[in-house]
Amino acid sequence: MTAFLTTDQVAAIHDLQSGQPLRDRAVLAGAVNRALTGWGDDLLYPDAEAQAAVLLVSLCQAQAFVDGNKRTAWVACDVSLAINGLRIVDVSDEAVVDLMLAISTKALDESAAADWIRTHTVVAPVRRRP
């Protein structure tokens, strides 16, 4: 079963890296919860990579924060993957900037973002607090 970030957790991620306020909590909740879209027990986004991609794209494009939307989206995606035993590897800062700009300008959709994530992730042990 996939673990999902909550709206409060994503807001906390934002608060750690930006002094700017939340613009719209409902917009944030909608972006965070898109990965949970489905029918009954069947999710529209079938795996952790697709769920991280929809979180990444939704947060980046929804503009729920006054500032820091792309940074928050990237960190939330990374945390979402980590809590599901995956880790992004061998990616330069420039590649991340290019990815985020492509998403923010809608040149890259959720499916392409999921493919990018799958290409750059490896299975990693989930770290639990003692």
Where are these regions (language model features)?
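FIC/Doc superfamily catalytic core
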Residues: 1-130
